[in-house]
Amino acid sequence: MRKVLAIETSCDETSVSIVSNIGNTFKIHSNIIASQIEDHSKWGGVVPELAARKHLELLPFVLEKALTESKIKIEEVDYIASTVAPGLVGCLRVGSITARSLCMLHSKPFLGIHHLEGHLSSILFSENYPKKSFLTLLVSGGHTELIKVDDRRGMQRLGKSFDDAAGEAFDKVGRLLGLSYPGGPAIEKIAKNGDPMKFNLPKCRISDKKGGFLKYDFSFSGLKTAVLRLVEKINLDGKTVPVPDIAASFERVVAEVLVERTIRCAEDHSLDNVVVVGGVAANNTLRKMMISEANKKSIKVHLAPLNLCTDNAAMIGAAALFRIKFKDHLSSLKLGVSGRLSIEQANTLYEENPPF
């Protein structure tokens, strides 16, 4: 049994987890998450400097709690991993420096993990996760991407958002509607009392320079602007803004766009397994719609466990375990962090000469 201590500090969650695997079975021994939502809610979004300082404050306590809850001593851990890209650089440094320091203190090998690969790996804690090639919809506050994953974890991005990520659009529309931060859960909650067909909001597409539209790519900036114009018009007319109806209509359109393009991409690439991960993957409307539409096409849907949709260290540990199992990858202790790194460049994190 391989055991990994993993650290995640790429944005506004401070998380430490102890995970292990035996063959194809992955187990979480502890997964402690300290959220900073209350610290950032008054600003309507994450303040990078504040987030980094909070990680410095919280990480020692989160680390101690993760070890205590797992009943595993750090000397018994086989590997130590941390998120190194992409993310907020100051936040990434806190986790990475801590992880590499622990590696030096306890003579443990280090793995730097790509944050998006971590999200992809959250599905490993689900029953009957796909063992062959599959399509992943990764949909979160910072990313909306369609990624093909082969049976050896080779990754190819097939679609992306050209502006706002879906989760970012939820936050911005939530703010427009006067809802609390983060916008995703707030919109989902109030949308339950609204009519999702009340407003005909646009499904924005990206033009292809060769003609037509890019079939697998996303754009949510125009949808956000449409909601803004709608709210402005209602206010100018002197009427009460029907927040539940707007929230429900917005939520429906986002889910429809995500589902339609995911199913189209899966069909075009002959992939009969779709994985949905990331913070927005917790949205119930999206989950139900994806399953319903995929069933019509004989495509099986694998949903990330609800408690592992948002940022957490267990998914980082799972990514590390998978790397060790199939590719025997280790990172240099000289590896730094980066705010940007495409998923196709994840293998560079294990080169003898680090990319940063």
Swiss-Prot record:
It is found in: Cytoplasm. It catalyses: L-threonylcarbamoyladenylate + adenosine(37) in tRNA = N(6)-L-threonylcarbamoyladenosine(37) in tRNA + AMP + H(+). It holds the Pfam family TsaD. Required for the formation of a threonylcarbamoyl group on adenosine at position 37 (t(6)A37) in tRNAs that read codons beginning with adenine. Is involved in the transfer of the threonylcarbamoyl moiety of threonylcarbamoyl-AMP (TC-AMP) to the N6 group of A37, together with TsaE and TsaB. TsaD likely plays a direct catalytic role in this reaction. It is an enzyme of class 2 (transferase). Fe cation binds at H115, H119, D311. InterPro entries: ATPase_NBD, Gcp-like_dom, KAE1/TsaD, TsaD. GO terms for cellular component: cytoplasm. Substrate binds at L138, V139, S140, G141, G142, D171, G184, N283. Its EC number is 2.3.1.234. Belongs to the KAE1 / TsaD family. Its cofactor is Fe(2+). This is tRNA N6-adenosine threonylcarbamoyltransferase. Binds 1 Fe(2+) ion per subunit. Keywords: Acyltransferase, Cytoplasm, Iron, Metal-binding, Transferase, tRNA processing. GO terms for molecular function: iron ion binding; N(6)-L-threonylcarbamoyladenine synthase activity. GO terms for biological process: tRNA threonylcarbamoyladenosine modification. The gene is tsaD. It comes from the Bacteria. Its main location: cytoplasm.
